[in-house]
Amino acid sequence: MNITATVLLAFGMSMDAFAASVGKGATLHKPKFSEALRTGLIFGAVETLTPLIGWGMGMLASRFVLEWNHWIAFVLLIFLGGRMIIEGFRGADDEDEEPRRRHGFWLLVTTAIATSLDAMAVGVGLAFLQVNIIATALAIGCATLIMSTLGMMVGRFIGSIIGKKAEILGGLVLIGIGVQILWTHFHG
């Protein structure tokens, strides 16, 4: 996977965390930068670990399905991207129903895990490709750190508008990467 695809994947994977951070930022009254950075660090750390876990799981199975690798990555990315788009169009966001209060550490960790399950599934798919998983996981984590911190800071202004559009955009990016993987396989 080339650098462009890695960066697109990283920011595509960060969109769930961005959307959750926008929602969290929207529920707080003037979130401080330190709160936004803490959220970004937690989300980024979890989002770095989950593709590594998924990659490890995928490596265990890779010798059994190596000839299907491009199809597995394609189907996973299409599925995850489609799910993100559907969630983006649904409109109901549990984060919007929380009262305006500061968010505790464990609530942030739980939210980070929930938004990073897609990254674990992508990690499974990446096990079947020629990819530097450490660099990819770090790129995903860094993108998530940036996007989650930014999401918290702008959340109070645009939470109800961009939150769902971010999921739609992230889903489209994942689908685009899936199509690119399949295209590269068939067209060299």
UniProtKB/Swiss-Prot annotation:
Pfam family, one: Mntp
Keyword NAD carried by entry: no
Membrane topology summary: Multi-pass membrane protein
Gene Ontology, cellular component aspect: plasma membrane
Domain of life: Bacteria
Keyword Cell inner membrane: yes
Primary location recorded for the protein, binned into one broad class: membrane
Keywords: Cell inner membrane, Cell membrane, Ion transport, Manganese, Membrane, Transmembrane, Transmembrane helix, Transport
Molecular-function GO terms, alphabetical: manganese ion transmembrane transporter activity
Transmembrane segments: 3-23, 66-86, 106-128, 143-163, 168-188
Subcellular location: Cell inner membrane
Family: Belongs to the MntP (TC 9.B.29) family.
NCBIfam families: PRK11469.1
General function of this protein: Probably functions as a manganese efflux pump.
Family annotation (PANTHER family): MANGANESE EFFLUX PUMP MNTP-RELATED (PTHR35529:SF1)
Name assigned to this protein: Probable manganese efflux pump MntP
Natural source organism: Shigella sonnei (strain Ss046)
Organism lineage string: Bacteria, Pseudomonadati, Pseudomonadota, Gammaproteobacteria, Enterobacterales
